[in-house]
Structure formats: structure tokens, C-alpha cells
């Protein structure tokens, strides 16, 4: 069966966002990453920066304590409200067109669909640390510490909303080490796999 929707989950600094954009360009479809944040900002009235930071990295506290903070929209925490709106927007987008979606727990949100192909991009910490300095520049925080903090928050967020383990192989159809294949190599491999699936 042809896979219309591709989701890209990724470790911080693995190049997953770039892979998603290049893949979408090669497929001739939209890539929803920053664009999804813009649409959510329009829909919710929340600031884009807040959505970008909270959509994948909240909650950073344990589940019990988090349940009692940040209430404000129909009795929901702002993050829970954002999750609901994000879920609805993703489901709406995939009904309209084939696309690539980066992050945002899209693999879980679309888990009931048969036309979705879920990918996880990872790489060794040393390689990711180099990349985040190249892409984002130096900060006061050591690169390894930065990526560990980001990954930890993504994992907590994913677990909180999906009750699944972030990065666990059986949540995805394909996992790739971008340090082995490179960005372009990952894109080429994904396209080959999609072609193989299409023929079955």
C-alpha cells in the first residue's frame, strides 16, 4: 500500500528536521514542521515560540505535579490544550494532502491510519554534539548536556501523551543512524524503502 503520510521523529541534533524537509522536497509534498507551528499559532492564539518550546518539550515535570499547574483553557493545562489542538490540526492536514510531518508525536496521533510510514532518526551523542554547534552555535551549556536535556524532555513529553517509550524501535517502521548514512543518504534510503512498499 502506498504511504501518503511520512512522520519523522528524531533525536536532537540528528538532522531529522533537515531529512524531513529534503524528503518532502524530493516527494513533491509539504513538510509540516515550522509551518505546523504557524498554523497552531493562528488556531490557538498562542505565541509561535511558546508552541515550538512546549509542543515537544512539555511537560518537564513528573506527571503528578504537572496535573496541577498551568490551568487556563476549559479546565485543561495550556500544554494539554495545545496537545488537543495539535492532534486535531495534524489529523485535519493529512485528510487534505500527502505530507511529511516532523515531530509533534505525529506517529502516535496517526497510529490508526494504514497510509502512514513512521521513521526515527538517531545518531551517537558525539556526532549530534558536533552538529548542534554547527547548526545552532555555541552556548554557555555544553553540547552534550544540551542534547541530553532536549532528548529527556522529548521523551517525557512523548511518554506523558502517548504512554509509549520515545525512540523505541517497535514504534516505528524504520530507524536510521544519520551518522552512518549522512543526510542525503538517509533521504535516498527512505525513498528506496517507500518505492519497495508501493510495489507490494
What are the residue ranges of the model-derived segments?
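Short beta-strand-centered segment that lines the nucleotide-binding/catalytic pocket of NTP-utilizing
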Residues: 30-41
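RNA pseudouridine synthases
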Residues: 99, 106-112
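Conserved phosphate-donor/acceptor-positioning beta-strand/loop module used by diverse small-molecule
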Residues: 112-134, 140-150
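Small-molecule kinase domains that catalyze NTP-dependent phosphoryl transfer to phosphate-bearing small molecules
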Residues: 59-67, 139-183
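Glycine-rich phosphate-binding P-loop
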Residues: 8-21
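Pre-Walker A (Motif I) flank of P-loop NTPase domains
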Residues: 2-11, 97
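ATP-dependent small-molecule kinase phosphotransfer cores
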Residues: 41-98
